[in-house]
C-alpha cells in the first residue's frame, strides 16, 4: 500500500505541471501559452467602486495596486486596513503573445462577483451591489473556456461582500491549456476528498 501511494505521488510530481511563476506588475501580466498560469501579482484595485469594463472608466480613476492573492481586508500595502464588508473592482491586463483558447479556473469570491473578459461577462455568482439591501451572496468555483487575443486582454472583477469575515478573493484565477487544466482540477478535487 505504501509503495502504491509513493508511486502515485511520484507520478503527480512528474506529470502535473506546477505552472509558471510570472507575476503581474502594476496590473499587467504576459501570457505566452503556459499550460498553467496563476494570475498572481499586482492587480489594480478600486475600493468602494464598481467600475464597468473599458479603458475610459479606469483612466479616470487612478488605481491602488494590491498583491493578489489576499483578501482586501488583509492587504499590507494599503494605507489603512479595509473592513471585510464593502465592494470593489479589480483589474488586470493580460498581454497575450498570440491568440490562445484557454481554460480559466475561477475560484469562489467572498461573496458575490461578476468577471468580465474584454468587456464580456463570462462568469459571476450572486448579485454584486454597493448596498447590502440589493446584494445577493453566493459562492461557486467555475471553469470556463475563453479566447485571449493577441495583445491586451482586460480582466475586470467586481466583488461585493456584506456577509463574510473576509472580502475579495484568496485563491488566484488560473488560466492555461484547456486540454490540461480541467483534468488537473479534477485530480486535485479527488486528492482533497
Residue ranges of model-derived segments:
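Short solvent-exposed loop/turn micro-motifs enriched in small/polar/acidic residues
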Residues: 85-87, 106-108, 137-141
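Positively charged n-region of N-terminal signal peptides that target proteins for export
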Residues: 1-4
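Bacterial N-terminal signal peptides
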Residues: 7-15
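Hydrophobic residues positioned within well-ordered beta-strands of beta-sheet architectures
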Residues: 41, 90-92, 104, 142-144, ...
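Extended carbohydrate-recognition surfaces in non-catalytic/accessory domains of CAZymes
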Residues: 21-98, 186
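Aromatic-lined ligand-binding clefts that engage carbohydrates, nucleic acids, or primary amines
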Residues: 93-118, 155-159
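An acidic-aromatic loop/edge-strand motif
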Residues: 28, 136-193
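Solvent-exposed beta-strand/loop surfaces of large extracellular or lumenal domains
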Residues: 62, 120-141
Amino acid at each position: 500500500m505504501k509503495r502504491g501511494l509513493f508511486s502515485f505521488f511520484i507520478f503527480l510530481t512528474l506529470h502535473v505541471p506546477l505552472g509558471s511563476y510570472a507575476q503581474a506588475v502594476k496590473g499587467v501580466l504576459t501570457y505566452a501559452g503556459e499550460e498553467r498560469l496563476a494570475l498572481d501579482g499586482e492587480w489594480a484595485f478600486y475600493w468602494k467602486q464598481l467600475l464597468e469594463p473599458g479603458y475610459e472608466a479606469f483612466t479616470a480613476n487612478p488605481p491602488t495596486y494590491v498583491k493578489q492573492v489576499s483578501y482586501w481586508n488583509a492587504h499590507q500595502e494599503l494605507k489603512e486596513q479595509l473592513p471585510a464588508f464593502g465592494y470593489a473592482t479589480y483589474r488586470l491586463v493580460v498581454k497575450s503573445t498570440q491568440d490562445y483558447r484557454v481554460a480559466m479556473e475561477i475560484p469562489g469570491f467572498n461573496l458575490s462577483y461578476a468577471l468580465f473578459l474584454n468587456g464580456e461577462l463570462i462568469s459571476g455568482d450572486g448579485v454584486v451591489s454597493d448596498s447590502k439591501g440589493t446584494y445577493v451572496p453566493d459562492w461557486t468555483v467555475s471553469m470556463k473556456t475563453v479566447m485571449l487575443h493577441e495583445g491586451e486582454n482586460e480582466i475586470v472583477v467586481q466583488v461585493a461582500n456584506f456577509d463574510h469575515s473576509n472580502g475579495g478573493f484568496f485563491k488566484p484565477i488560473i488560466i492555461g491549456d484547456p486540454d490540461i487544466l480541467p483534468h488537473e482540477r479534477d485530480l486535485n478535487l479527488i486528492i482533497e476528498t
